Amino acid sequence: MQDQTTTRWYHYVSYFFGGAFLANTIPHLVSGISGSPFQSPFASPPGEGLSSSLVNVLWGMFNLVVGYVLVARVGRFELRQTRHAVVFGLGILLMAVMLARVFGKFHGGNL
């Protein structure tokens, strides 16, 4: 029988992508809650056009649920375990940098 506390390689992959999904939650949820249109995969053209605030709230919540599942329901994520936290943080960082570059060209952030 396998030890329940063993972290497998795919747990780290899950924590990385969980961090990425959770980072992607923020711009969509904040824009949606504030009533502002924002880019989404459902806009025309995808990722460039603007989607309604409702679409962004729903997309942000979808990202939140997927991020939760990947972090909290796969393996035994422990924020106090350095490797778990680093992999999770790298997922957040990579997605945040990508989002800054992509959305910066639409909102004046790429100086």
What are these regions (language model features)?
Residues 2-111:
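Membrane-interface extramembranous regions
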